[in-house]
């Protein structure tokens, strides 16, 4: 069984749905990327263009995002494709209005890696934007509904970035919908990082039970009513677990 590293997203998945973790990370049956995730990638491309080029018009940044979206969804069968595409211009605009006052980022998509004592594999990730000159980093999230505070899985993710970029870093998350935006400062970084570490330790203990992927099928049982098993994932789950 091949396993080389953790990521905040995989560890959050391990917490949220052990069986989906088995399907994707142990069995290698990755689910098709849906329109929401593709939209997030495209919006980030447009926003990065606008941040790195302060004189670029909003329209040109939107064009970058739409071209990216059209490219990565060209073969997508997601019926929501056009609906999500239509929200990209407003999301790019919202995010740039929020983040351009920070200036030009010193880093984009900066790789971070952490391997604390007791872990066999490192936890790695890529932070979206860092302004070294301000001691600030921001992770950008696209969403349908604006949250009133930082979501816990996102807090764990950004705590990793913050801890790997300096003791006094001001870590923030910016959420954007087509009509609203908000930026929240991450607090309790050490506590969230500790939680991520503990989840990783339990994940490795789970993986250490066997080198045989079939073992994890025999010892787990998916809840197919969970939203994790919507769409094609449910049929794949039926085939893998046999019920």
Question: Language-model features: where?
Answer:
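Short glycine/proline-enriched coil/turn segments at helix->beta-strand junctions
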Residues: 100-104, 132-136, 165-169
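Flexible, glycine- and charge-enriched loops at secondary-structure boundaries
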Residues: 36, 147-154, 186-189, 193
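Metal-dependent nuclease catalytic regions and adjoining charged, substrate-binding loops involved
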Residues: 165-243
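Non-catalytic protein-protein interaction segments used by genome-maintenance enzymes to assemble
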Residues: 112-158, 163-164
